[in-house]
């Protein structure tokens, strides 16, 4: 089997505002990095699935037709939750103007792909059955901004000839006090038995089959409702190497694998399930683990070499 990796120009986005609205969205070149770690996961590499089949709900229809696939060389810009903090969500028209400026500037730099951060903290920049609206939209998690930001992002990206991939942090629910308050619809409160704690945050339990299914179903929801060109995970997998993070789940599993191998298996199971969910809709699925294989394997239990 083949491992596909691509290089991309990594560019930061920042907004410079004055009274009366946004003056201009600048894209500052932070540097050119090789995305040796941008991997398209091949199911045969991962082997037979041990993940349960998709649940009966939701009932899904065919996905909207995405824009033409990007050229083989991916020249991508990351638009992260940090950029959304400087974007105007006060109305659809205001957000559309900001989004259009961002996409126009990205296209003018010769990029062809946008990784748009649409689910950073177990909350979403779109209406979802699985996750509340992001606190980034209104300042309050779970509060409807009155429009669909992701729909606007897809439209404005495609208008500039850009492909748009929905960038997701699969496990992270809260980190270093962000968001400051979780709403009642957060998975952390709806499913407390799915949650693991560190000193600085809350994370979905990678070992939970229910969590894996939930995340795969949320991928199907995205692919059903939006003409996105890809699903993109970054390098936030296991947040700690501490044995007590999931000692109870490990003991309950009865696994004969070492703790490290068991954790890697859990991440592989999620990758396999989400890959299958996206590819059922002919939507690309990619992962950008950190740049060293040892850091991936031993620090976050993501077996990028296997992928």
Q: Where do the protein language model's features map onto the residues?
A:
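Active-site-adjacent "subsite" loops/lids of carbohydrate-active enzymes
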Residues: 72-74, 78-93, 171-221, 302
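Aromatic-lined substrate-binding rim segments of carbohydrate-active enzymes
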Residues: 120-168, 264-270
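Glycine-rich, aromatic-flanked loop segments that form ligand/cofactor-binding clefts
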Residues: 76, 111-119, 149-195, 232-234
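An active-site-proximal structural segment forming one wall of the substrate-binding cleft
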Residues: 105, 109, 156, 203-235
